[in-house]
Amino acid sequence: MKRCAPSAWLILSVVIVCIGCKMAPAMGATRAAVPSTAAEEVTFMNGPLSLRGVVYKPTGPGPFPAVLYNHGSAPGMVNSQAFDAIGPRFAARGWVFFGPYRRGQGLSVQAGPYIGDQLDAATRKGGISARAAEIVRLLEGDHLSDQLAALAWLRRATFIRPDAIAVAGNSFGGIETVLGVEREPYCAAVDATGAAESWSKAPELRAAMIRAARNARAPIFFFQAENDFDLSPTRVLSAAMKDAGKPFETKIYPPFGTSHQDGHSLAYRGSAIWFDDVFRFLE
């Protein structure tokens, strides 16, 4: 078996923990120079629903390996910050980066309600437990459907190697990544900070992600900063994969910034810190 490039899968699991290591670079100093790459806006369909996303391509005709990147829950175009920070890095290393916007966010804002508004409505109606149940309903339903529609678009693209499509994502996008790799045979997956804010308050979400990790159809690399909201997702989900005999890696990076929110932002503000580790895992 192989991952996304011509190198063998690691069957043994690897756990790298950096708690207590030297402090990571300051948040404002983590952006290494990356060749400028212009993003191309594209349209993809989910049944009758028209959705949009951005693609960063390497130079040349391809076909190339690709990563489908699931964004977080931020409103409007805020998630473009992650795409702009990460997409050019992949393109510079010969990978296509596809950032699809799910319904209600970014370039797909007109395609449906914003998930944050839906969760707030659930909270007003039924409290924290209702919000937790709504997270699972939406991320396993409409939003997973949007992810799989984006994957179908990638597989049809002539410049893509359909056997070399990885999936990644941060925060809610990390949750989407784990759910997606249960459904589809991606070549590899990267969950950055997925469920860190929701884990302790959402038992249904914990159960869904543990199930998905046990059933994962590709290896997963879990990473977080030491000062993220909660490190339990990485620990519990990697343990579930280990129990199921599935390949995985984990890495807990030194604190990023000073607050929990800073730590949670490592996935997009600190791409210079983790990119080489992720790229090694994918290849």
Where are these regions (language model features)?
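Alpha/beta-hydrolase active-site loop
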Residues: I115-A157
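Alpha/beta-hydrolase
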Residues: N70, P100-R102, A192, Y253
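Primarily recognizes the serine-hydrolase "nucleophile elbow" in alpha/beta-hydrolase
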Residues: L139-N215
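Bacterial N-terminal signal peptides
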Residues: W9-G20
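C-terminal catalytic histidine-bearing segment of alpha/beta-hydrolase fold enzymes
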Residues: P247-E283
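N-terminal cap/lid segment of alpha/beta-hydrolase-fold proteins
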Residues: M27-P61
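The feature captures the conserved acid-bearing segment of alpha/beta-hydrolase catalytic domains
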Residues: A188, T193-E249
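Short substrate-entry loop that stabilizes the transition state in hydrolases
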Residues: G62-F64, G72-V109, S198-W199, D230-L231
